[in-house]
Amino acid sequence: MKLTSEKLPKNPFYASISQYAAKNQKSFQWEKEKTDHYSHANLVDKALQLLKKRILKGDTLAYFLRGQLYFEEGWYEEALEQFEEIEEKDHQATYQLGVMYYDGLGTILNSEKGVDYMKKILDSPCPKARHLKFAAAYNLGRAYYEGKGVKRSNEEAERLWLFAADNGNPKASVKAQSMLGLYYSTKEPKELEKAFYWHSEACGNGNLESQGALGLMYLYGQGIRQDTEAALHCLREAAERGNVYAQGNLVEYYYKMKFFTKCVAFSKRIADYDEVHDIPMIAQVTDCLPEFISRGMAMASFYHARCLQLGLGITRDEATAKHYYSKACRLNPALADELRSLLIRQRI
């Protein structure tokens, strides 16, 4: 399973360029202008001009913010250059370099170098690096879990994630809390009570992936007493927030409960997501793992195909059904095969 890096934690002093600008209004007179008519490109250009002025005056934070703006715009080569110039002066730049080298953003992928940068953050005694330590620990745990840049070790990954999760602290790495939930529910032997605990902590701290996972644990009584009402509450809320895996599982629930009209309407919307462009976009917006997004799409595609094949809640159309069956197989062959096996045994 391919995991994703923890996003840069907010700086306790300046969480964003706009907050920085508000603290430096004399230098950022454009804040008084009406910018509603500006395009995104105009605003980015304006911000870069103003940051350049601050840099010329020796403002090192402005230098980092310019690199971060490049990063957020997807201009990774420019961001890498900015961060490398100030890595010895700015811990946030060091953190971002770790992410960029590990994930191969703006440079050739170099997991070892990415790991070294994260260790540098974790081992730093500087107070200015404190807000980055939990996120760095999560990323190091990911490296040990994936065996990239270091020798693979689930035990070391678990240790680092437990540190990063900090007993459910909302200011720690919520991503680590969610990952612990996933880890304990997939390791052998499974530790479902621990999985439920960590998904609960992460969900309480706003994690969308864990909210969907909690719904499934309630639905099937995994690590907690079965509670359909609580399950549907979690799944529906997660689905509304954009969790595609939760959406796919709701499709399955509606089908099994014979709510075919509802199943068809909901499944079509999910099944019609573009598998090439929508998955990475949804992953970026929701911070859900691409593997679970594609799994949710595959579930929706399969059940939509089944409804079309049998004419359940929709006019029968076997040709279109074949299209959606094929899409389910492309998205997740193992899941499609599992559902097909249930179909053959007349359990669907």
UniProtKB/Swiss-Prot annotation:
Tell me any Pfam family this protein matches: Sel1
Task: Tell me which positions the record assigns to the signal sequence.
Answer: none
Q: Which windows of the sequence hold Sel1-like repeats?
A: 94-126, 134-169, 174-207, 208-243, 244-278, 298-333
Query: Does the keyword Cytoplasm feature in the UniProt annotation?
Result: yes
SMART domains, per this entry? SEL1
The entry's keywords: Cytoplasm, Repeat, TPR repeat
Location in the cell: Cytoplasm
Q: Its GO CC terms?
A: cytoplasm
The stretches annotated as TPR repeats are 60-93
> Domain of life here?
Eukaryota
Complex and partners: Interacts with LRP2.
Q: Which PANTHER family match?
A: LRP2-BINDING PROTEIN
Biological role: May act as an adapter that regulates LRP2 function.
Q: What is this protein called?
A: LRP2-binding protein
Per the UniProt entry, what species is this protein from, by scientific name? Macaca fascicularis
* Taxonomy of the source species: Eukaryota, Metazoa, Chordata, Craniata, Vertebrata
